[in-house]
Amino acid sequence: MKRLPSLLTICLLLTALAATRSLSQTPEKRVLSLDDLAAIRHVSDPQVSPEGNWVAYTVRTLDMKEDKRNSHIWMTSWDGSRSVQLTSSKDSETTPRWSPDGQYLAFLSGRGDEGEIDQLWLMNRAGGEAQRITELKGGVNDFVWSPDSKRLALVVKDPDPDAPDPKDKDKEKKTAKPIVIDRFQFKQDEIGYLDNRRQHLYLLDLATRKAEALTPGNYDELQPSWSPDGSTIAFVSKRGPDPDRSDNYDIYLIETKVSAAARQLTTFKGADSDPDWESSLAWSPDGKSIAYIQGGASELIYYAVHQLAVIPAAGGQTRLLASSLDRNMTRPSWSADGASLYFVLEDNRSEHLARVPASGGSIERVVGGQRVVGAFDVNPTGKLAFLSSTPNEPAEVFALDAREPRRLTRQNDELVAKLKLSAIEEISFKSKDGTAINGFVVKPPDYQSGKRYPTILRIHGGPVSQFDNSFFFEWQMLAARGYVVVAANPRGSSGRGQAFSKAIWADWGNKDAQDVLAAVDYAVAQGIADPSRLGVGGWSYGGMLTNYTIAQDTRFKAACSGASISNILAGYGTDQYIREYEAELGTPWSNPAAWMKVSFPFLHADRIVTPTLFLCGDKDFNVPLLNSEQMYQALRSLGRDTQLVIYPGQFHEITKPTYQRDRLARYLGWYDKYLMPRPDGESGSPARNSR
């Protein structure tokens, strides 16, 4: 008689069989392709519910079929076990905000609006469809709940009295009125020509759905923040005889009733809570203090370090809580007990979640390491959720438990699990004058030690920004193609203090160019880069520094210069940087030598021999198209290999998905043509190089 196997034996056999089958069915990892651009899910804006059981957040994706970006609101349970998509309309939804009583989740959307203007919507947690709450002609740009959940403060732009009715079928046939300009700064990217319409605060009564203007006048009012007792709103405004001529933002207070007069709280001659600096106003839980981010003196423009500050709400002296640390700080938020302040601390190649006692003292890096912490939220019970990205993981939402990060969302896990991503290595080296410079090197996934690879130097924009330990699709794409990517943070970058950033003051294309060239020298010396197959490229200031670099070094066989300028004289009055130009360079007629000095890539275009691809959006008011046109024309006149690609309807940021893909494909096509030519002599078009 045969002996039957035991239940344990059967279970073990079945487990082994399942494991074998699982292993045999596990797909082999592949390198990243251009098609994966549309698969990345961009997670942002975590918001913890008042009771702490849920975290709302947004997910942005690219819809290649409809050729648009979509943003929808999701929610994850605090333990991370459940993830729910809350909105799924054909239009986007952003800015989820819980009402303090937990009954509603408000958000912004242009749903059903012919002009695609954002309005305020409410979703009742008890169930039912979201409802549109406002129908304001100027739309809603921002909002914040009152502590009692009965009102909301809105940021609303004055409507354009000359704007055509979106429902008018003949609006395209009507002649537009002339544009009349009388402002000092009269252009801004994504907005266009600036008129005298402003953004104002409105009070919305939730019961009556009536919105009334709280701050009429000739100034913009931004970043509203309610006092804990609901009696006062703090906001930021730039006032004075001609606000366009400085970045001197100040904090004001106003009672929450129509016709109340605003009272100025800060008087620092620089930016208090600059709206362009990921800042906001944060009342202490007891209502006695307001935390914010203070910039440097106005004359330092964007080179100044931004510091965490606290001021008494009743008025008084501002205190800088971490002035001993020469680093940028953003996103101030009080702890639930008011004893300390959380903020994001930018450091060398990373951004960390930090905390400092409200009375001042030592800074604690609550979440550190080789990562980039982004937006975060602390709810009234002290629960904290934050965004975190690493070089091999796009941003996801994490919870902070006992000072340890715990992951809540896994929006990109399925994609990342399929990919053979390149490791990102931190590097440090010396520039020509001995200055220590930091950066990254990215090697192909199947990199072989001892073999030299075609190498591309990528340069970041800014200039006061940095390459950091976050996920860069572009780096992974180039590495997957077989390139080594070298990315440096030259002088002018952020992350290493004000003096390091200001080292290029009125001296663009000199020290910073030497620093990025030293990165290439490092890669060659390490036996990684093939010195005969070098490429370079960047966008915005990265494109500018590309032009500076190829105008003084002929080693590069291919360059991609995006949204760049070389003839700085051409920027005066044609882009949005008039205030910064005059602060740093003076005026062209009072200091022509300074302007000529930084315009040398155009004035000495004959020194450029590198085949160069120029790219730009035709509606870019940040670094307008005319600058790319000039450089293209100069190189074309000299008989150099060059090409100009113009993206219709695009601003400084290329947002249309098919254009995003096209740009990356053209990078690959251009670099391949000169750095990895095929045996048949064909260069490869974007279509042929799309994977």
Question: How does the language model describe each region?
Answer:
Residues 9-18:
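Bacterial N-terminal signal peptides
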Residues 26-67, 71, 201:
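Mature N-terminal segment immediately following signal peptide/propeptide cleavage
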Residues 41-56, 90-108, 129-130, 135-152, ...:
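Conserved beta-propeller blade repeats
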Residues 65-70, 112-118, 192-198, 243-249, ...:
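Short, solvent-exposed loop/turn segments at conserved positions within beta-propeller repeat blades
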Residues 69-71, 157-204, 248-250, 305-308, ...:
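Predominantly five- to eight-bladed beta-propeller fold
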Residues 77-81, 124-128, 205-209, 255-259, ...:
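Short loop/turn segments that connect beta-strands within beta-propeller blades
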Residues 165, 241, 298, 403, ...:
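Cap/lid segment of the alpha/beta-hydrolase catalytic domain
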Residues 472, 487-691:
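Active-site-proximal cap/loop segments of hydrolase catalytic domains
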